[in-house]
């Protein structure tokens, strides 16, 4: 399929959004209201919901491993895999919130594989890559949209959404780096075997040159 841009609007935000993080909720709210107003005038239609991308200085990945001893050999079910994934999501991450989880692989015996369902084992080890951000970064962003009375359809991790559109699957399979140079931040995402393996946002950008 193809994507067509029907309208575009922007507001100067350097005084209240710094390195991708909302610092002044009121001013961010005002900018959002103005953007929606301009878009609706251009489109001559009402915008009901919006998709919001989150990135910024605090966004990065952390790895986690969940071990589960089954006591006896049994066939690994989807319910068991889901239970391990739920345990990973519930892990504390020090004043941060998990934005998205990328399952890496599962270790069964001495073997690693992407899909363990149907394999017989008495032990399973799940490896996960958690994309996290400061809790207040996500909260301030959501609060700004709430105060502007703009309904959010979904909250997306911006680098993942951009890479999905711009990076060919063959490159992700072979291994590649996706680098997004911004004004105040630079985002680096590493892909290998079709999966995200590392992501970080560096607080340096074009304004530092």
Segments predicted by a language model, with ranges:
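Short, glycine/acidic-enriched loop or turn micro-motifs at the edges of active sites
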Residues: 182-183
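Short beta-strand scaffold segments in enzyme catalytic cores
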Residues: 1, 186-190
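Catalytic P-loop NTP-binding/switch module of NTPases
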Residues: 209
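Short C-terminal beta-strands that terminate individual repeats in beta-propeller domains
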Residues: 201-202
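Nucleotide/phosphate-binding catalytic cleft detector across ATP-hydrolyzing
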Residues: 1-178, 195-197, 206
């Amino acid at each position: 399929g193809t994507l067509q841009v029907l309208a575009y609007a922007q507001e100067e935000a350097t005084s209240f959004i710094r390195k991708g993080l909302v610092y002044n909720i009121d001013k961010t709210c005002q900018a959002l209201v103005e953007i929606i107003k301009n878009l609706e005038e251009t489109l001559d239609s009402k915008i009901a919901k919006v998709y919001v991308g989150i990135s910024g200085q605090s966004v990065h990945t952390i790895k986690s491993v969940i071990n589960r001893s089954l006591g006896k050999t049994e066939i690994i079910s989807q319910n068991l895999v889901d239970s391990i994934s739920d345990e990973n999501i519930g892990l504390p991450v020090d004043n941060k919130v998990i934005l998205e989880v990328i399952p890496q692989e599962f270790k069964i015996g001495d073997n690693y594989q992407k899909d363990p369902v149907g394999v017989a084992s008495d032990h399973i080890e799940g490896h996960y890559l958690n994309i996290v951000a400061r809790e207040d970064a996500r909260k301030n962003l959501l609060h700004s949209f709430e105060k502007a009375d703009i309904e959010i359809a979904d909250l997306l991790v911006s680098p993942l959404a951009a890479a999905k559109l711009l990076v060919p699957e063959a490159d992700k399979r072979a291994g590649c780096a996706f680098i997004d140079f911004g004004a105040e931040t630079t985002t680096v995402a590493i892909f290998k075997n079709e999966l995200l393996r590392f992501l970080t946002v560096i607080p340096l950008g074009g304004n530092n040159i």
